């Protein structure tokens, strides 16, 4: 499906006026990819009684997991909006471009959380505390090694990366990247503690409080930092 959609993009998308065709191809490829999974569901799924379903008892735990995501999205949106209000739309644009590049690197660092979460959950469910500690120590060492290397690597090339990706008018993105590269290590450690420890060990309340508290502190500090340093204060 992916190869077919890629071929159609090269064949049918010729210039900027073909945006509609491009959107249709992407939508059809997504639908087609999902439809290819349906024939296999008959082997995996079994019939169940509707009376045996109790969706409401899962609602509160699900909401508690959803709150940190809401808090994170709110303060990310407020970062850009506050920067646009206090420092102008240009600074908000520079921040957005810098943040996009950092998120690409962060995707590699935080991917370990997706891998480690089921392993730590399984060990904790079996009462294997020693194994949980071992997994977390190994993960912390790996994430630290990877994140610190990426932080210094990104900071080293940040001066040229902004203009290389976005053009000569995006010089301020370079310094913003250099400053923001620090969060690669901080978010990497946060991922180990939050996603790989607090969530698997059923300490969702502690995880939620830490994320919400961090979001509130970030919003409060934004006022003086953005007022004094503009783009670099928001970063």
Outline where the language-model segments fall.
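Short runs within selected transmembrane alpha-helices of multi-pass transporters and secretion channels
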Residues: 1-6, 22-39, 68, 72, ...
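Short helix-kink/termination motifs in transmembrane helices of multi-pass secondary transporters
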Residues: 7, 62, 66, 70-82, ...
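Helix-terminus/linker motif at the lipid-water interface of multi-pass membrane proteins
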Residues: 11-15, 73-104, 122-123, 159-169
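Helix-capping/transition residues at the boundaries of transmembrane alpha-helices
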Residues: 12-14, 84, 121, 198-199, ...
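Interhelical loop/hinge segments that connect adjacent transmembrane helices in multipass membrane
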Residues: 16-26, 32-76, 115, 119-134
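Interfacial/gating helices of multi-pass transporter permease domains
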Residues: 19, 57-65, 83-103, 130-131, ...
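Alpha-helical transmembrane segments of multi-pass membrane transport and lipid-handling proteins
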Residues: 35, 133-189, 216-223, 227
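Helix-loop junctions and terminal segments of transmembrane helices
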Residues: 98, 102-140, 144-147, 194-200
